[in-house]
Amino acid sequence: MSLCILAAGKTVTLSVAAFTLSWTHSVEGTRWQEDWKVTPSGLQLVEARIKGSGAGMEPPEGAVLKNGWWIYAPDVGPQRRVVLAASGATGDGWTLCTVQGCLELGKTAGDTIALEPCGSTGSSQPR
C-alpha cells in the first residue's frame, strides 16, 4: 500500500504500510501521537498517545499511563480520508513519520492537508 498526501493541489506518494502522526495541542501545549496503518479499506488508527491530560484532552476509558503518556487503542473503523487543518496557534503543524523518515506538514494557519490510501496507480482515490 501507499499513502497519498494531498496539499496545495499536489499529491505526494509514500510507499509505506504504516505511519505515526504527531502534533502539539493548541491550548494545552501537550504532545499527541497516533499510529496508523494504510489498508485497502482506508487508514486504520491503531494506537494513540497523549503526553499528560488537560482541557479537552482527557484520556478515554481503558487508557494506560506509561512513562508520562496516556496510551490507548481508539475504537474507530478505517477512515477513507484524514483531513488536517493548521490553527497557527502552536507555531508548528503535524509531523508524519515512517520508517523512511519524517515530514513536517501544515505549519501555516489555514493549510489543509489530506491523507488517504493511494489507488493502485499511486494516485489519490476518487471520493
Residues covered by each model-derived region:
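Mature, soluble, non-transmembrane domains
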Residues: E58-R127
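N-terminal secretory signal peptides
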Residues: C4-P59
